[in-house]
Amino acid sequence: MALILNEEQQSLKDIAKEFLQKNAPVTHFREIRDTENELGYDEKLWKDMVDLGWSGILVPEEYGGFDFGMVGMGSIFEEMGKMLTPSPLFATGVLGASLITLGGSNSQKQNYLPQIVDGSIT
């Protein structure tokens, strides 16, 4: 079954594709792998992803996010998969953000969700 993206989702996918082709080609993954990067990802690339708003896609707007949904996030991951892009986006922007949004206390949401959006925690 083909997924039909709306205009905003398609735009996000196109931006992700262009950004990742330019900044994170497969050779970039190999460099990180071969240098045995302790983090397992490029900190500058992660900061750029945060600046594009990717870390806040699933975070509700009231906490500084975009509440854009799983389809939007999925379109980014599709492009990341094509480039073998290592990043903390899944662990932080999907798992962390979703768990806190769905099961966190108000205090936890107020404390952690803005930090996920601004990239200060991973």
What are these regions, as identified by a protein language model?
Residues 2-25, 54, 62-63:
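Flavin-dependent oxidoreductase catalytic core characteristic
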Residues 24-122:
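Glycine-rich flavin
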